[in-house]
Each structure stands twice: as C-alpha cells, then as structure tokens.
Design a protein with these regions (language model features):
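HDAC/HDAC-like amidohydrolase catalytic core signature
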Residues: 1-159, 164-309
Length: 309
C-alpha cells in the first residue's frame, strides 16, 4: 500500500499574530514526526499552487481576487477576529488548496492508494465567499469538486472529525446531493453550527455533535450508529477526510478527550468504507490540532494507519 505525504515550505510563511494557535510550528512538528524511519516508505511530494480556476470550483472568482488583493506587502491584515493575512499567506493558501488537488490526482489515477496533505492554512470554515476561523479556501470542498469535474466521480464523501464544525463545507454542499458531508464536533462550540437538525436540502449533511467531556466511547458510538451507516448507504467514489486533531485530550481549544487509539480506529473505519465503496481511495487533509505534542502523536498514528490499513 502506497501513501503519499504532501507538504510545502510555503505553509510556514503564513504568519499569524503572536500567540495565535494556528501557527507554523504545527507543520514543523508534523515534518519532524514523519521524518522518523518508520515512515521511510512514504511517498513524498510538494504541494503546487492551485490555479484560480480550480479554487473557483467552490469559490467565486471575485472572492479569490479579493483575498489576493487583501494580501499585505508587510505586516498583518486582519480579515476577521481570528483570520489574518501576512505577506506569505496567499501563496500558502494557494498551495494548501493545490495540495488537496494533487492528492486527488494521485489517488484517482491510482498512482498511490491514499494521501495525507499537511498544509496550512486549513480550510473547513471557509464558506463560498467568506474567510473564517483561520481559513481562506475550502480545501476539502475543492478536492471533492475536482474529483467530480476532472475524474467523473459521481459521489464524494467528506468526513470531518475536527472538534469544530466545518460550517464552510456544509455551506458549500448544502444543496448538493452528490456530496455527503459528515461531522463529529463539540457542541456548543465555535462556529455554532452543526446541529443534528441541519441535514441539507437532500439529506446529504450528517451532523453527530459531541458534548464537552465526551471521549473515545462517545466518538466511536457517533460513527458506528450515525456516520458509518450513512456513508455505506451513500457509497462514495472517494473518501475525503477533514483531519482535524483538536478533539485530542491535550488540545487547548476544546473539551473532547480523544487519544491516539481513537484516531487509529476512525482512520481504519473510514478506510474500510473506502475499500468497500471507493476502491480504497482516501484523501486526508489537515485541518486543526493546536497542542503540538497531541498533534504530532495523532498525525503519526493517522498516517501509520493510512500506510498499513
């Protein structure tokens, strides 16, 4: 089984304000972890910059250009309370989306079995025409649309286990029966969306919120009783994971208590669905995860599971 690891140094050049949790050290710790000899068989590549027409599969062109125009020559530009741009942010965002596109290309053509893209900024809070929650372009949504438009995938599934609900992904696919979006997340918590009652126009949105203090048992129950049955019924041609690791016990931004075995378990379960429905095709894209030790450990077991099944 071949797993591709995609990253790029440009991801380090998106510089947030001092003390911001979504910081370059996140990619540095992932790089250090994946340099270990146990990952020597990983295929590796660098994320290209996504062309505007690929990003425009999910975002209006005038929005893309507005983000480009907002890019500062020096210093920081704040777009909302949580989301700022430095001079390197726009290229990093293009390559974050481009890494997602590359992952789809490599998986859909059968060059690799699956792929993990570790880039920043993340994407799942970005709505069609709104940056939000550290996010500019919705990488998972772009990946799904690219698989459909370029490779003829009839159905794509995005499974999001970040502790924050992916309001942007839900927004983009709310009225699209060809994409299923499934999410576990703490509720109530930022951004305030993700209730069970939010189902989409075609019942293609599956929200399974968790409560503060929940851990692996509740997480696995949400998948076993809600998400996995819906995924199997949907029979996706591609499984895309919005891989946020901020539901880890150590994470400072939330109150869910997952540990490394929980991330192994969910990765294997999603690979089983992909094996049953999608010829094993899995694309995993980094979202959140803000405790560096918890992030490094979680990514290590997630990628190990992708490599070994």
């Amino acid at each position: 089984m071949t797993t591709l690891y995609i990253t790029h140094p440009a991801g380090l050049q998106h510089i947030p304000p001092a003390g911001h949790p979504e910081r370059p050290d996140r990619l540095r710790v992932i790089e250090r972890v994946l340099e270990h000899e146990s990952f020597s068989t990983l295929a590796r590549d660098q994320a290209p910059a996504a062309p505007f027409h690929r990003i425009a599969l999910c975002h209006p062109m005038d929005y893309i250009e507005a983000i480009q125009d907002a890019s500062p020559v020096e210093g920081l530009v704040r777009l909302d309370a949580d989301t700022s741009m430095s001079p390197g942010t726009f290229e990093a965002a293009l390559r974050s989306a481009g890494g997602a596109v590359m992952a789809v290309d490599e998986v859909m053509t059968g060059k690799v079995n699956n792929a993990f893209c570790a880039m920043r900024p993340p994407g799942h809070h970005a709505e069609k025409a709104s940056p939000m929650g550290f996010c500019f372009f919705n990488n998972a949504a772009i990946a799904a649309r690219h698989a459909q438009n370029h490779y003829g995938a009839e159905r794509a599934a995005i499974i999001d286990f970040d502790v924050h609900h992916g309001n942007g992904t839900q927004d983009i696919f709310w009225a699209d029966p060809t994409v299923m979006y499934c999410s576990t997340h703490e509720m109530p918590l930022y951004p305030g969306t993700g209730a069970v009652s939010e189902r989409g126009e075609h019942n293609n949105i599956v929200n399974a919120p968790l409560r503060a203090g929940d851990g692996g048992d509740e997480f696995e129950q949400a998948f076993e009783t809600v998400i996995l049955p819906r995924l199997r019924d949907f029979r996706p041609d591609l499984v895309i994971i919005s891989a946020g690791f901020d539901a880890h016990l150590r994470d400072p931004l939330a109150n869910i208590n997952l540990l490394e075995p929980d991330y192994i378990w969910v990765t294997r379960k999603l690979m089983e669905v992909a094996d049953q429905c999608a010829n094993g095709r899995v694309v995993s894209l980094l979202e959140g995860g803000y405790d560096l030790q918890g992030l490094g450990r979680s990514v290590a077991v997630h990628v190990t599971a992708l490599m070994r099944g």
